[in-house]
Amino acid sequence: MSLNYKSSLLEILGIIFLSTIIFIFTTGGKIIYFDNIDWLFGSRNIVTDSEQHYISWLFFRNSDFFQFPLFKNYHYGMEISSSLIHSDSIPIMAILFKAFKHFLPFNFQYFGLWIYLSFILQGLFPFLIIKKFTKSYLIGLLCSSFFLLAPVLTYRLFWGHESLFGQWIILCGLYLYLNDYNLKKWIALSSLSLLVHPYFFAMITLLFFATLISDLDSVIFPFN
């Protein structure tokens, strides 16, 4: 194992540690427990969107796995069934855990896990972006801390916007924009964003076209 690889691994572990500390400081940490649903239901005496997201997941998990459309939530809604996408229940997580529904407790929730993973990735991508401009690990940590504590992020937690907490998807798009064009990575990120929230898909699409324009400009005007 090369020294550079060890150094990079230690840096990433440091970011994960920082993200975990801020996750615990911000949420208390207990939301990651799969059987903890109390935080989703009125613990703040405020009606948020979390209740809707969880209830939609309960209906979806009890529908057939092989159905068409895949994310159709036939039992959810009044008379006219809806789609899991419309209830902001993070489709990529829902379809993953639906495959194991027979092994999950009734009060199972994946939203806490999603938030924790989002904290880690929210800290990682700013670090990777800033590393393209400076070799300072301290500056990278400060940059990650800024994005982890940004009010625009923590605001989503307060109002129960779990899917929109995945703002790291936008940062990942910026990271791809700053690197060499790779169509496969853009397709993967676009697909992922669509399985999290349509808003992210729209933003990633704009970044993708910006990348195409930038790449085309470098071909037409190679000396710019």
Q: What do these predicted regions represent?
A:
Residues 27, 102, 212, 216-219:
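Transmembrane helix-loop junctions and nearby membrane-interface residues
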Residues 116-129, 138-178, 183-215:
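Membrane-embedded helix bundles of polyisoprenyl
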Residues 22-122, 150-152, 161-166:
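Membrane-interface coil-to-helix junctions
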